[in-house]
């Protein structure tokens, strides 16, 4: 999808260019009507200055709160963005089913933990919960070490 957007809009995909694109053009790039709505909402927030990715709050919970104000972005999406795009070391996506399943396997729990229990189990791993998340994903896809 991203390659198709770059082919249509050029290598510097900008909010302005995306907003100027017609529905059918974006549909041909793989964006459904719903995804286009989310993308347009995001572009409008960036253009208006309501959202500046270079100036997200340093506090992880504040950054998550700001990102989840974007239509179509939930807590999981915000956490994944902060972990991988921003490299924030203490992000723990406790609602991620693979994190829960990996933790279940890693800690030899009787059942997959709930989101609440997943958060509680990782409290002592702060400020390195991002690394723990990556490790639990590994354990989900592979044998535990």
Task: Enumerate the predicted regions with their spans.
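Alpha-helical ds-nucleic-acid-binding substructure associated with the helix-hairpin-helix region
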Residues: 1-69
């Amino acid at each position: 999808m991203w390659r198709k957007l770059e082919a249509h809009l050029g290598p510097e995909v900008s909010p302005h260019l995306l907003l100027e694109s017609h529905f059918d053009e974006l549909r041909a790039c793989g964006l459904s009507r719903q995804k286009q709505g989310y993308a347009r909402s995001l572009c409008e927030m960036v253009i208006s200055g309501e959202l500046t990715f270079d100036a997200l709050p340093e506090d992880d919970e504040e950054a998550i709160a700001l990102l989840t104000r974007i239509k179509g972005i939930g807590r999981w999406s915000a956490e994944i963005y902060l972990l991988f795009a921003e490299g924030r070391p203490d992000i723990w996506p406790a609602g991620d089913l693979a994190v829960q399943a990996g933790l279940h396997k890693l800690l030899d729990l009787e059942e997959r933990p709930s989101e609440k229990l997943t958060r509680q189990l990782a409290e002592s791993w702060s400020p390195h919960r991002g690394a723990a998340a990556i490790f639990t994903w590994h354990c989900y896809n592979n044998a535990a070490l």
